[in-house]
Amino acid sequence: MAAQYYMEFEKPVVELEKKVQELAELAGTNAELAGEVTKLEKKVDRMREVIFSNLSRWQTVQVARHIERPFTLDYLNLIFTDFTELHGDRLFGDDHAIVAGLAKLDGEPVVVIGHQKGRDTKEKVYRNFGMPNPEGYRKALRIMELAERFRLPIITFVDTPGAFPGIGAEERGQAEAIARNLREMAALTVPIIVVVTGEGGSGGALAIAVGDRVLMLQYSIYAVISPEGCAAILWSDGTKGEQAAEALKLTAKDLKELEVIDEIVPEPLGGAHRDHEAMARTLHEAIARQLKELKAIPAEQLVEERYQKFRKMSRFIEG
């Protein structure tokens, strides 16, 4: 599908695409013009392929944040069936920035948890811009404990700029909620698959991202802090986000090389936002394949391998 919103670096291909559309409207039944349209369409695809195969880290950040990228609820509708949402943390309230519930993947029951952003202003406010409060993480943990009790695999979708930093969130124990999730997820005896679909922002992402397999979409990002936040701390200038993005090494390719993630899931030409259904098909295959492998691993081994997976990410370099 054609994207409604374009990024600055796409401008050359977008301008050509508009001209192709105009020519296609003029062509009508003219076979000669129709042939030219086909040639130009192929040229558009080639241009887009060149652009997206050479994205800088900062450009990748822009793609990861694209407002039309599929969110958790989109993947729930396209990959899973029989989704039943579960609400509340049984302590404070329900956090709309995290969606959680029961679903079926290829007929098999699973638990699905994910950050949820909004597309328009009203929905963005309702979802708190995808930034969970402590009750969101406690809700996620409550649902994960249900998965443990009923021996259901857990699949999480990560897409958040970070945990909500408001005063109320701190008063209700934001840090404790995140830390507890990390500890409890590390010990769960059911398979856990994590998919970073857009932004993987710091502890706010990690609180639902301790898994046996961590996948990243091709143009998603995952880092300890946003580029703008990093720039504000290092140089007291949030506008130096592009420079910070290069230093953070936050792309899927970077993190695969660093062995932080296990698999990069290819996106459709131009990004997941251009074809939700194609992206969902590719991701469905990757999740199903990884889940089949994990189901064959004994629970005790699963927990030990998960622990070792995250333990080896800490490395000291002596200079």
Swiss-Prot record:
Annotated metabolic or biological route of this protein: Lipid metabolism; malonyl-CoA biosynthesis; malonyl-CoA from acetyl-CoA: step 1/1
Record's keyword terms, sorted: ATP-binding, Cytoplasm, Fatty acid biosynthesis, Fatty acid metabolism, Lipid biosynthesis, Lipid metabolism, Nucleotide-binding, Transferase
Gene3D superfamilies: 2-enoyl-CoA Hydratase, Chain A, domain 1
InterPro entries the record matches: Acetyl_CoA_COase_a_su, ClpP/crotonase-like_dom_sf, COA_CT_C
EC number: 2.1.3.15
UniProt key word Nuclease: no
Pfam families with a match to the protein in the record: ACCA (PF03255)
Every CoA carboxyltransferase C-terminal domain range: 39-293
EC class of the enzyme, as a word: transferase
Disulfide topology: none
Cellular component per GO, a single term: acetyl-CoA carboxylase complex
GO biological process, one term: fatty acid biosynthetic process
Family the UniProt entry places it in: Belongs to the AccA family.
Record PANTHER family: ACETYL-COENZYME A CARBOXYLASE CARBOXYL TRANSFERASE SUBUNIT ALPHA (PTHR42853), ACETYL-COENZYME A CARBOXYLASE CARBOXYL TRANSFERASE SUBUNIT ALPHA, CHLOROPLASTIC (PTHR42853:SF3)
Function: Component of the acetyl coenzyme A carboxylase (ACC) complex. First, biotin carboxylase catalyzes the carboxylation of biotin on its carrier protein (BCCP) and then the CO(2) group is transferred by the carboxyltransferase to acetyl-CoA to form malonyl-CoA.
Quaternary structure, from the entry: Acetyl-CoA carboxylase is a heterohexamer composed of biotin carboxyl carrier protein (AccB), biotin carboxylase (AccC) and two subunits each of ACCase subunit alpha (AccA) and ACCase subunit beta (AccD).
Protein name: Acetyl-coenzyme A carboxylase carboxyl transferase subunit alpha
